[in-house]
A protein has these predicted regions:
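Glycoside hydrolase catalytic-domain context in secreted enzymes
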Residues: 1-677, 684-698, 705-709
Length: 709
C-alpha cells in the first residue's frame, strides 16, 4: 500500500468537506451478527458507516445503495474472515488452513490460492479479507494454531508475503495482517493473555513477517486482543505509531479486533470508562473500531470538548480513504468479477495442487504407496467421514449451532469418500470406532471397528481432533489424543493388519503411541474440500508426497513449547522423564524417493557486513520416483554479543527432480541475513564466523562456514 499523489489530493479535498460526524463514521465498522440495542445496525446503515463486517450478497448491495444516498456518498468497505478461501460462503472453494498450506513450503501455489480467494470474495461483492494470520504458533496449547503458518519467523514472512501478493495483485480485495503483534505467544498458550516479551524480542521474532507483508503491499492491519509486557496492543503507541508507521512506512489503515476497545475497560483495566478507552485506542494509532457501537458518539463528543485533537481523526480517515480510493470504490471504478468464478475449475485445480503438496508423510515402513489395490480396505476412525473436522475453523458452519443442518457441496471429499473414489475395485468397509471426545456410543462403535479390521487386508485409521478443540477460547492444557482414540488404535493393531494412520487435526498432537503402532503415518491438518481425495491419492501413489512440517511435534505436552529456534540451555530439550527431542521436528517430511545433498559451498569465504553472497548445493534424486524436494538453509552465529538461537531458518527452495536427476540450488543472501537485533533495537551483523547448514531436514544437514569482516 503506497500513497498515490492524485488520490492524496482527492482525499484532502474530501476530508475538508466532511463534518466531524461524517469523518468519525468512516472510522467505524459494524457487523450484522453482533448484539446491539434495537435499531442500532439500521441507524448506522442510514448514517453511512465506513465499513461492514460479514454482510454478504444482497444485504451488502442494500448497504451500498443506502451509502449512495448520504450527503458525502462515501462507499463502505466490506470485510470477511476469508482465512482459507471464501469459506463463509457455502459453495466457494475451501482450501487447506494456513497451517496445512504452510506444509507445502510453496510460495507460488500459496500466491495462486490468495488470488483465487480474492476472485471469489470479490465476485461475492466484498472488498477486504481478514488474512493472513502472521502469529507464530510456538506454544501449541493455544487454540488458534491452525490459523497460522506455523512456528517460524522466516517461513511465516515468506508465505505471508506470497498470499498478500495473491490477494492484492489485481486490486480485487485488500489483505489484513493479523494479529499485530505477538498474539500467538500469550502466556501459557491462553488466548488473549499477556505476551511476556521485550521490544527487542518483538523486533527479532514477531515483527519481520509484518515487515515482509507490508513490502508485499498489504493495505490493512488488525491489532491483537492481548498485550505485550503489560501494554494492551490496542493501546500500544510505540508499536502502532513509532514502529509500524515511522519505521516500516505502513500507509494503510489499522483496525481493532472484535470489540477490542471494550476489553481495555473490562479485561485489561487500563481505562475506567468507554470515553477513555476510545481516546486511548485512537491516539495510540487505531484508525477503525470494530463493533463498539458507542465509538462514534464518544469520539465526536471528545473532539468537541477538546480532549482529542481533530488532526488525529483526519489522519485516521485519510488512511481509510486511501485504501478505498486504491480499491476503486469511488466513481464507479470498482472492478467486480462474475459469480461464475466462484468454485470455477481453475480454482478447484489450484486447491488440488496445494492440497497435494500440503500433506506430510511422517512415517513409512515401506507399506506405501499401495501399488496393488487391496481386496478389502477398512476405513476406521472418528475423522474418517467428518467434513467439519476436516474443514477446521472459519467456514460457513464452524460458528453455528451444532443442531443446524448445512448441506455439504458435492465436491467435498472425506478420507472415506476419497478411498472409495481412488480404490473403486476394492471393497471399502467403514466403522467410526469412537468419537473424538468420547460418548456413550463408543463401545458399540469400537466392536464394529475391530470386526472390520479383522476382516480387512489393510486399515486406514483416521484420528485427530475437531472444531470443539480448536479456535478462539479453545486453548488446551494437553495435546494428547482425546476420548478413546488411543484405545481404538491399540485394538485395531491387535487385529494384526497393516495400519496407515491419517491425522486430521488443527495442530500438532502427541501421537507417539499411535505412530509406533502404525506402519505409515500421514499428517493432513485441516485440508479443506479435497483433503480426503488427495490423501487417498497419496496412499495409492498417484503422486509423491513433498510436504514438510512448518511446526514441531512434541512427544508429550510437558515439553511445550518445543519450537526449534530456541536459545541453548545446559540440557537443551532434555527432561529427565521423557526421551530427548521432539517426536517430529520442524522441516521434517518423508517422500517415496530419496534425495542426496552434496557440494555445499559459499561464493565468498569472507564478506563485509553489508555484502551479498551465494550459497550453493547439489541435490540428486537417487530414488525411483519423480518428486519435489524442499532444501532448507539454516544459519548460526558461533559467537555473538548477546545469545542467538541454536539455528535459524534463513532460506528454502522447493525444486522438482525426476528420478536420477541432479540440480544445483543457489540461495542469494546478504550479510544482514546473518545478523540479529541488538539491545539498542537495531539490526547488526557482528564480525566473526558463521555456520551455514543446508539439507532436507534438521537431522540431515551439510555444513559450511563464512566469515564476516
Amino acid at each position: 500500500m503506497k500513497k498515490n499523489p492524485e488520490n492524496e489530493k482527492k482525499i484532502a479535498s474530501l476530508i475538508s468537506e466532511m463534518t466531524l460526524e461524517e469523518k468519525v463514521l468512516q472510522m467505524f465498522q459494524i457487523s450484522n451478527v453482533a448484539e446491539y440495542p434495537e435499531g442500532t445496525y439500521e441507524k448506522f446503515i442510514e448514517a453511512g458507516a465506513g465499513s461492514f463486517l460479514h454482510v454478504l450478497g444482497k444485504d451488502a448491495d442494500a448497504v451500498r445503495d443506502a451509502a449512495a444516498k448520504t450527503r458525502m456518498k462515501i462507499p463502505p468497505i466490506f470485510g470477511i474472515d476469508a482465512i482459507h478461501g471464501h469459506a463463509f460462503l457455502n459453495g466457494a472453494v475451501v482450501f487447506p488452513t494456513q497451517l496445512g498450506m504452510a506444509c507445502s513450503w510453496n510460495e507460488e501455489l500459496i500466491e495462486k490460492m490468495g488470488q483465487a480467494t480474492a476472485e471469489e470474495v470479490n465476485a461475492d461483492g466484498l472488498d477486504w479479507v481478514f488474512s493472513p494470520v502472521l502469529c507464530l504458533a510456538r506454544d501449541t496449547r493455544w487454540g488458534r494454531v491452525d490459523e497460522t503458518f506455523g512456528e517460524d519467523t522466516y517461513l511465516t514472512g515468506r508465505l505471508g508475503a506470497a498470499i498478500v501478493r495473491g490477494y492484492e495483485k489485481d486490486g480485487l480485495v485488500i489483505s489484513c495482517l493479523k494479529h499485530y503483534i505477538g498474539y500467538g505467544e500469550a502466556t501459557g498458550g491462553k488466548d488473549s493473555y499477556d505476551t511476556e516479551a521485550t521490544i527487542r524480542k518483538v523486533r527479532e521474532t514477531f515483527l519481520p513477517p509484518f515487515a515482509e507483508c507490508i513490502k508485499a503491499g498489504a493495505s490493512s492491519i488488525m491489532t491483537a486482543y492481548g498485550s505485550i509486557d503489560g501494554t494492551p496492543l490496542t493501546a500500544h503507541r510505540t508499536l502502532m505509531r513509532d514502529i509500524l508507521r515511522d519505521e516500516l512506512g505502513f500507509e494503510g489503515f489499522v483496525v481493532t479486533d472484535w470489540m477490542n476497545i471494550y476489553h481495555l475497560i473490562k479485561k485489561q483495566r487500563v481505562a475506567g470508562n468507554f470515553d477513555d478507552a476510545a481516546r486511548l485506542a485512537v491516539e495510540s494509532g487505531n484508525d477503525m473500531s470494530m463493533n463498539c457501537y458507542e465509538f462514534c458518539d464518544s469520539i465526536v463528543k471528545q473532539v468537541r470538548e477538546g480532549r482529542i485533537d481533530e488532526s488525529i481523526i483526519d489522519e485516521a480517515v485519510a488512511n481509510i480513504l486511501r485504501v478505498k480510493f486504491a480499491l476503486g470504490l469511488f466513481d464507479g471504478k470498482r472492478k467486480r468479477l462474475p459469480r461464475s468464478v466462484i468454485a470455477c475449475p481453475e480454482h478447484i485445480e489450484i486447491n488440488r495442487e496445494l492440497t497435494r503438496e500440503s500433506l506430510v508423510l511422517l512415517k513409512n515402513n515401506g507399506i506405501l504407496p499401495l501399488k496393488n489395490a487391496p481386496k478389502k480396505i477398512a476405513v476406521i476412525g472418528p475423522n474418517a467421514d467428518d467434513i467439519k473436522a476436516q474443514f477446521g475453523d472459519w467456514v460457513y458452519f464452524s460458528h453455528r449451532p451444532e443442531s443446524e443442518h448445512y448441506p455439504i457441496k458435492n465436491d467435498c471429499y472425506t478420507v472415506l469418500r476419497g478411498m472409495k473414489e481412488i480404490f473403486p475395485d476394492s471393497e471399502i468397509v467403514y466403522a467410526k470406532g469412537c468419537s473424538v471426545r468420547g460418548d456413550e456410543s463408543d463401545e458399540a462403535e469400537m466392536t464394529l471397528a475391530v470386526k472390520a479390521a479383522e476382516e480387512a487386508d489393510i486399515v486406514i485409521l483416521v484420528l485427530g481432533d475437531d472444531i470443539t478443540l480448536n479456535g478462539e477460547c479453545k486453548d488446551r492444557a494437553t495435546l494428547e489424543l482425546t476420548g478413546r482414540q488411543n484405545e481404538l488404535a491399540r485394538k485395531i493393531k491387535a487385529a494384526g493388519k497393516p495400519i496407515v494412520t491419517v491425522l486430521v487435526c488443527g495442530k500438532p498432537l502427541c501421537v507417539g503411541d499411535v505412530a509406533e503402532l502404525s506402519d505409515a503415518l500421514i499428517e493432513t491438518f485441516n485440508s479443506g474440500d479435497l483433503g480426503g481425495l488427495c490423501t487417498a491419492e497419496l496412499i495409492a501413489g498417484k503422486y509423491n508426497p513433498s510436504g514438510k512440517l512448518p511446526i514441531s511435534f512434541p512427544r508429550t505436552s510437558g515439553q511445550l513449547p518445543c519450537y526449534y529456534a530456541q536459545y541453548p540451555g545446559w540440557h537443551y530439550f532434555r527432561y529427565c522423564d521423557v526421551e530427548e527431542g521432539n517426536l517430529f521436528d520442524f522441516g521434517f517430511g518423508l517422500s517415496y524417493t530419496e534425495y542426496e545433498y552434496s557440494d555445499l559451498s559459499v561464493s565468498k569465504s569472507e564478506i563485509a557486513p553489508d555484502e551479498d553472497f551465494e550459497v550453493s548445493v547439489r541435490i540428486k534424486n537417487v530414488g525411483s520416483y519423480d518428486g519435489k524436494e524442499i532444501a532448507e538453509l539454516y544459519t548460526r552465529d558461533t559467537v555473538s554479543s548477546i545469545m542467538t538461537p541454536i539455528r535459524l531458518l534463513k532460506g528454502f527452495s522447493k525444486i522438482a527432480l525426476r528420478a536420477g536427476e541432479e540440480k544445483t540450488v543457489t540461495f542469494h543472501m546478504n550479510a544482514a541475513d546473518l545478523g540479529f537485533i541488538g539491545n539498542d533495537g537495531k539490526r547488526v551483523t557482528e564480525p566473526g564466523k558463521f555456520e551455514i547448514f543446508v539439507g532436507g531436514s534438521l537431522s540431515s544437514l551439510l555444513k559450511t562456514e563464512i566469515f564476516v569482516k
